[in-house]
């Protein structure tokens, strides 16, 4: 038993990766290619991707919505986690990094046809999804894009997931900045606001998971 979350030492982190992450070979190859980019710090951790894939299986997810794709690492991990008739809709402002690293692995793993990559402002794409296929059309949504728009993304994703569906908000800790009252940056304020919105809605229940840079889980109740 422990009364609070333990901090991960390097040894414990290595142990977690050894026994808590079963990373498919195409996903691992994409992660390694991403590490060759100067922006590799934008990539989600393998333990977080594993956790999200497990959640998808636990709720029987078939339709996954991703806001912020980067090279498509989590995109591919989730596509592989879904059943054969599953589909990932991935939103990003650019396909630059997918073309640099991800698309080859999507194609070689046989997952490219399951991934619908939509390029453009994410809020606009989410509004289009609300029109077609409509509210409640997704089982899970994962928000990991420009932080200042997190409140907008959460508000739209809350409509797009079905009852008992999940909205996951990445960077919920923001490197610890969310807990610093002196940090008044717009990005920090926006993450705090999205967290507050999820917490205070009576049609959602939340849990904050200390994985990666913090993951806020919000389950739609009705």
Could you describe each region identified by the protein language model?
Residues 1-27, 37:
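N-terminal auxiliary segments of SAM/dcSAM-dependent transferases
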Residues 30:
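Beta-strand-loop-alpha "switch" segments that mediate conformational coupling across diverse proteins
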Residues 42, 46-222:
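S-adenosylmethionine/decaboxylated-SAM
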């Amino acid at each position: 038993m422990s009364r609070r979350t333990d901090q991960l030492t390097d040894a414990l982190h290595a142990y977690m990766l050894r026994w808590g992450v079963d990373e498919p070979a195409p996903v691992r190859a994409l992660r390694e290619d991403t590490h060759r980019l100067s922006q590799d710090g934008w990539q989600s951790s393998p333990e977080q991707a594993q956790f999200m894939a497990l959640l998808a299986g636990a709720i029987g997810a078939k339709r996954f919505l991703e806001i912020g794709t980067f090279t498509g690492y989590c995109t591919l991990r989730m596509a592989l986690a879904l059943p054969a008739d599953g589909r990932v809709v991935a939103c990003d402002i650019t396909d630059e990094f997918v073309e640099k690293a991800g698309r080859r692995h999507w194609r070689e793993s046989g997952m490219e046809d399951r991934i619908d990559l939509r390029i453009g402002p994410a809020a606009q794409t989410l509004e289009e999804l609300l029109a077609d296929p409509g509210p409640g059309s997704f089982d899970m949504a994962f928000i990991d894009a420009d932080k200042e728009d997190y409140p907008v993304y959460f508000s739209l994703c809350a409509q797009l997931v079905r009852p008992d569906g999940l909205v996951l908000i990445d960077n919920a800790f923001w490197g610890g900045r969310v807990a610093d009252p002196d940090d008044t940056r717009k990005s920090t304020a926006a993450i705090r606001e999205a967290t507050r919105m999820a917490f205070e809605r009576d049609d959602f229940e939340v849990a904050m998971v200390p994985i990666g840079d913090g993951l806020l889980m919000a389950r739609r109740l009705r």
